């Protein structure tokens, strides 16, 4: 099943940019998923197991590099057209 997940990471620290960029780079390093970064959130598309595995790995990376964070996640069981408006890292 193809899913689209919208992720917004909010590190609970002053130096938050590094944690967010590391989180996005970790997602982008995973195989079998597509990652689209927008101004306020990042979209991940792919097979359910691949998307969930990529999020788990990225969360472990964020957990090691921050003092705490909040991850707001929305998941839909559809291939949403989120390609327009994304930012390159």
What is the role of each PLM region?
Residues 1-89:
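Charge-rich, low-complexity N-terminal segments
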């Amino acid at each position: 099943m193809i899913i689209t997940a919208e992720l917004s990471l909010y590190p609970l620290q002053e130096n938050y940019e590094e944690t967010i960029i590391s989180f996005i780079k970790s997602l982008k390093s995973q195989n079998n998923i597509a990652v689209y970064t927008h101004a306020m959130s990042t979209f991940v598309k792919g097979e359910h197991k691949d998307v969930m595995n990529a999020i788990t790995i990225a969360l472990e990376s964020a957990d090691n590099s921050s003092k705490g964070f909040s991850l707001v996640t929305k998941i839909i069981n559809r291939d949403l057209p989120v390609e327009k408006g994304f930012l390159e890292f």
